[in-house]
């Protein structure tokens, strides 16, 4: 009988956080964990072709395998370029 592992799948929005615990077969992938969590059905804004994923803030691929106790994180796309935002803030403070 294959070993089972327990993994958490997390997706955070400004107003709500989702954290689903799933039990998977040993050798399961990041994508399998996300699909088993049901988050793709709950949140239609998640697109695995566009959203980046990670395990404990470390970027990973959908095909990477998960380990027991991992927290798989689905990241939202950036809505603004961080460099452009810093530049705008610097220009604003210089103009004061």
Swiss-Prot record:
Origin: domain of life: Bacteria
Database matches in Gene3D superfamilies: RnfH-like
InterPro entries noted in UniProt: Mopterin_synth/thiamin_S_b (IPR016155), RnfH (IPR005346), RnfH_sf (IPR037021)
Homology family: Belongs to the UPF0125 (RnfH) family.
Name under which the protein is recorded: UPF0125 protein YfjF
